Swiss-Prot record:
SUPFAM superfamilies: Lipocalins. It comes from the Eukaryota. Expressed in liver, intestine, pancreas, kidney, placenta, adrenal, spleen, fetal brain tissue and tears. Disulfide bonds join 28-134, 61-185. APOD occurs in the macromolecular complex with lecithin-cholesterol acyltransferase. It is probably involved in the transport and binding of bilin. Appears to be able to transport a variety of ligands in a number of different contexts. This is Apolipoprotein D.
Length: 189
């Protein structure tokens, strides 16, 4: 009984902490990823254009920078500008899940947190990227994360719509997606 109460308390905490995040019943969707993915072409700076809201990204001018480390892993540096003008950042590492699907990565930001999926569903490497992540919770429901990224702070609306259509066609709800403010943003390190 105590274990059940602890589990229910933890779930209630998850729901309370995840306001705005996309919780759904059932297991995670399994969308196809970018074919013939080339991580070397993916490296560099990406600007967040839209996302399914997350509890861990609340600022504006959100940027991600990917670089190859000596150990073969990918260094991930995510940065955002807070309302008070300070830069919030987190650094992590991404690694391929398996070599047959190099667009399926796992990213880890802290030694005490589990790795999270980071799947590149679509990219042309020079303009846009569509990233999806999903975490299944006790086999009852899942939480979705999705990001539309661009090499520049803006992306044509027709490109954004096309990327959202990829998500929708794979049963990933885009109704909660929000635009990331990239107006008058500095280039973060």
């Amino acid at each position: 009984m105590v274990m059940l109460l602890l589990l229910l308390s933890a779930l209630a905490g998850l729901f309370g902490a995840a306001e705005g995040q996309a919780f759904h019943l059932g297991k995670c969707p399994n969308p196809p990823v970018q074919e013939n993915f080339d991580v070397n072409k993916y490296l560099g700076r990406w600007y967040e254009i839209e996302k399914i809201p997350t509890t861990f990204e609340n600022g504006r001018c959100i940027q991600a920078n990917y670089s190859l480390m000596e150990n073969g892993k990918i260094k991930v540096l995510n940065q955002e500008l807070r309302a008070d003008g300070t830069v919030n950042q987190i650094e992590g590492e991404a690694t391929p899940v398996n070599l047959t699907e190099p667009a399926k990565l796992e990213v880890k930001f802290s030694w005490f947190m589990p790795s999270a999926p980071y799947w590149i569903l679509a990219t042309d490497y020079e303009n846009y990227a569509l990233v999806y992540s999903c975490t299944c919770i006790i086999q009852l429901f899942h939480v979705d994360f999705a990001w539309i990224l661009a090499r520049n702070p803006n992306l044509p609306p027709e490109t954004v719509d096309s990327l959202k259509n990829i998500l929708t066609s794979n049963n990933i709800d885009v109704k909660k997606m929000t635009v990331t403010d990239q107006v008058n943003c500095p280039k973060l390190s």
